[in-house]
Design a protein with these regions (language model features):
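Structural motif
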Residues: 138-140
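A structural alpha-helix within SAM-dependent methyltransferase catalytic domains
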Residues: 129-136, 160, 164
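Histidine-centered catalytic/metal-binding microenvironments
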Residues: 147-148
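C-terminal helical cap(s) of enzyme catalytic domains, especially alpha/beta-barrels
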Residues: 2-6, 152-169
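An alpha-helical appendage that flanks or caps ligand/catalytic pockets
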Residues: 2-134
Length: 169
């Protein structure tokens, strides 16, 4: 509403909101940074680092970097500065795998802090349902999930069977 009012517009009362995000239902005994979880959601989590890098390259802006990820950002920036690609073309290497797969050298940057800071729906079915209910209470109507492409069928099926079937509508 604030953004609309700044440009002299009024949002309709039934304004539909959707968030592009990612999800992974944890298996018993599994943690947020297990290999399977990174296989399924690493590409989307890493896209945040790519975005932060782009902003930083554009104007040095680091205001969008979550405080909980500041050390991770420093490590990632050092990692990018050692890339073989010349600075003028480095964006091509930065975005390799962007939203489709996690580049093996970047997997170490997928941390619990990054997942939480970027809104990932990662947890047990009950935890994910709670996250969805909290976001719904804030006005979110829909989530669009983007898992890593080679894991999409399994990831989306798990979400459908273990979360959506139990989510109250």
């Amino acid at each position: 509403e604030l953004g609309a009012s700044e440009v002299n517009r009024i949002l309709p009362s039934a304004f539909h909101t959707s968030a592009l995000t990612y999800a992974c239902v944890l298996k018993p005994g599994e943690n947020m940074v297990s290999d399977r979880v990174i296989d399924e959601i690493g590409a989307m989590a890493l896209a945040a680092l790519h975005y932060w890098w782009e902003l930083y390259q554009y104007n040095g802006d680091t205001s969008s970097i979550a405080k909980s990820c500041q050390n991770l950002w420093d490590e990632y920036l050092a990692f990018t500065e050692k890339m073989e690609t010349p600075p003028s073309k480095r964006f091509q290497q930065i975005h390799l795998g962007h939203c489709t797969f996690a580049v093996p050298e970047e997997r170490r940057f997928v941390t619990e802090n990054l997942i939480r800071a970027t809104g990932g729906l990662v947890g047990t079915p009950d935890e994910i349902i709670t996250m969805l209910e909290e976001r719904e209470a804030m006005g979110l109507n829909e989530v669009a999930l983007l898992p890593s492409m080679d894991q999409a069928r399994v990831n989306l099926n798990d979400f459908a069977e273990l979360v959506i079937k139990r989510y109250r509508c």
